[in-house]
Curated annotation (Swiss-Prot):
Tissues/organs with expression: Ductus ejaculatorius.
Primary localization: secreted
Name of this chain's protein: Ductus ejaculatorius peptide 99B
GO cellular component, one term: extracellular space
Lineage: Eukaryota, Metazoa, Ecdysozoa, Arthropoda, Hexapoda
UniProt record similarity statement: To paragonial peptide B.
Organism listed in the record: Drosophila melanogaster
Pfam families documented for this protein: Sex_peptide
Disulfide-bond pairs as recorded: 40-52
Length: 54
């Protein structure tokens, strides 16, 4: 029982590390954020009252 829980914790910790290590000044990351917001406004905006960001 301890082994699956330990593996889950290791996986979650590694994913958190990847999320925190993202370079948010990278031009590719900035462009992907702009593309995501544009997609959100076009597809989800009317359903969320025009809001797409958290």
């Amino acid at each position: 029982m301890k082994t699956p829980l330990f593996l889950l914790l290791v996986v979650l910790a590694s994913l958190l590390g990847l999320a925190l290590s993202q370079d948010r000044n990278d031009t590719e990351w900035i462009q992907s954020q702009k593309d995501r917001e544009k997609w959100c406004r076009l597809n989800l905006g009317p359903y969320l009252g025009g809001r797409c960001r958290k």
